[in-house]
Regions:
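Conserved acidic-Pro-Pro-aromatic motif
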Residues: 39-40, 106-113, 191-298
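S-adenosyl-L-methionine
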Residues: 1-117, 122-127, 131-133, 177-181, ...
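Short internal loop-to-helix segment that lines adenine-nucleotide cofactor pockets
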Residues: 66-87, 151, 166-229, 241-242
């Protein structure tokens, strides 16, 4: 089976297969939307092109290619919001999609991309180089509740055992260590406050944070940032996980909650839910920054 995988996920062969499938999609089963291996491109409305290199373990790449980048998460809002931003922190950058999109849309922006996992880090660096981007600073550390060294858990992909780099996106700092084939590695950690104090990139306008369940631990140690800079924070809010912890942190600094829905950003009084309503991301907005997103509020 490994020989078969090596064949269809050879970048050149994969390009031919997916191009053919895309043309025949109207008459083919949806299950034939194969994972992507190698390079693919994203083109914005102004004709600017973004190159992304990936492998078949990246679910993000699969969605971007088959569904279109404007249909991925909150991309349609992000590309308009990022044009107003001077400093963007991408915490849990993975292969760099949002960092790359940010520089494509805003050539004057400063981007700090954090990625401690070795597989995503490899492709993040490669994608920045492929696009000849100069404004993305890559940090191979994990933001955490303390400074030092921790065990970071990466997934060893059993299906594609021959691959060196896994992009499953579930690497984490200890929030998930069971029921999957996790391998621990040592990574350097910094608190958010300490990192920003040491690096001093200026006031942060926007933070996107997706760290597989440790977001609240990172943000607990971002009190100086949240109280003084008041950045917009886009955070994954999966049902029945850390919603209460996130809500408590942001309420302390008078933030408002805007859930991302298919129609836009919907203001809610609480992000804690009794049942899963399908919301996966929340925009945490301080009232002083509402002008950044007022066009998207429904």
């Amino acid at each position: 089976m490994q020989a078969f995988y090596k064949l269809i996920y050879n970048p050149r062969i994969n390009l031919v297969l997916r191009s053919l499938i895309k043309r025949l999609l109207p008459i083919l089963p949806k299950g034939l939307k194969i994972p992507i291996a190698g390079k693919f491109t994203i083109e914005n409305k102004q004709g600017k092109t973004l190159i992304i290199n990936t492998n078949q373990t990246s679910y993000v790449s699969r969605l971007l290619y088959w569904e279109g980048y404007l249909n991925f998460e909150y991309s349609d809002i992000f590309i308009e919001l990022i044009k107003k931003v001077k400093v963007f922190y991408d915490v849990g950058s993975n292969i760099g999609y949002y960092s790359l999109l940010a520089e494509m849309e805003n050539k004057n922006i400063k981007i700090i991309a954090f990625e401690p996992a070795s597989g995503p880090l490899h492709y993040l660096k490669e994608n920045v180089k492929l696009n000849n981007f100069k404004n993305i600073q890559i940090e191979n550390i994990a933001l955490s509740e303390k400074n030092g060294i921790i065990e970071f858990y990466e997934i060893k992909n059993q299906k594609y055992s021959y691959l060196k780099h896994n992009l499953a996106g579930e690497g984490n700092a200890g929030s998930k260590t069971k029921h999957r084939n996790f391998v621990p590695i040592k990574v350097k950690t910094k608190t958010f406050n300490d990192f920003v104090e040491e690096k001093s990139h200026g006031p942060i306008d926007l933070i996107k944070i997706d760290t597989e369940g440790t977001e609240h631990l990172i943000l607990k140690n971002a009190d100086v940032i949240l109280s003084q800079m008041k950045p917009i924070v886009i955070c994954e809010t999966l049902f029945n996980t850390i919603e209460a912890e996130l809500e408590a942190i942001f309420k302390k600094y008078d933030y408002e909650f805007y859930n991302h829905t298919e129609n836009g950003l919907q203001k809610v009084n609480t992000i804690v839910r009794n049942q899963d309503d399908g919301v996966r991301n929340c925009f945490f907005i301080h009232p002083t920054k509402l002008n950044f997103i007022d066009n998207f509020i429904v």
